[in-house]
Amino acid sequence: MIIFPPQDFITWTNTLTQFPWPIQLNDFPPYAEKLGWKPTPLPDEFSVCDDSDVEDVILGVIRSEEICDLFLVMARNETEDFEGAAELNDHFVSCVAAGQKAWGEPFLLEAGEDPAAAWRLLNGSFAQFSGGGDALLLRFVTPQGWWRFA
């Protein structure tokens, strides 16, 4: 099931790069609101859709409570079959093409069972789109999480 189209991947990433990083976990709610994300009972999770059964954004933090990365499932193979895996693969290709159009060639591009593509962005952050047979994941790495790609 495609949860979010490629343009959402691009729009959210471009908006995230505009934020004044570093941002503390407790200071993130107004920024989440700018993305249209709503708070949940957990301080490191935000709801992206009105449907509470759909994925939430999960924030990763470092010891200083600064956000270092964000994770969001963009598509899921709910049928767990080959057709669903093929649909995920097609969605991965669409998202990589959208990323190439927005930011140029990825510095990381891996094919195979667990494909991935990643881009260095202007503010020292990174966007990564990765997948497999069961889900596709958007990962935005803030400048505070740079070491994840060192």
List PLM regions with ranges.
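Short helix/turn-capping signatures at newly exposed starts of structured segments
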Residues: 1-113, 123-126, 132-150
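Long, hydrophobic, well-ordered secondary-structure blocks that form the structural core
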Residues: 118-119
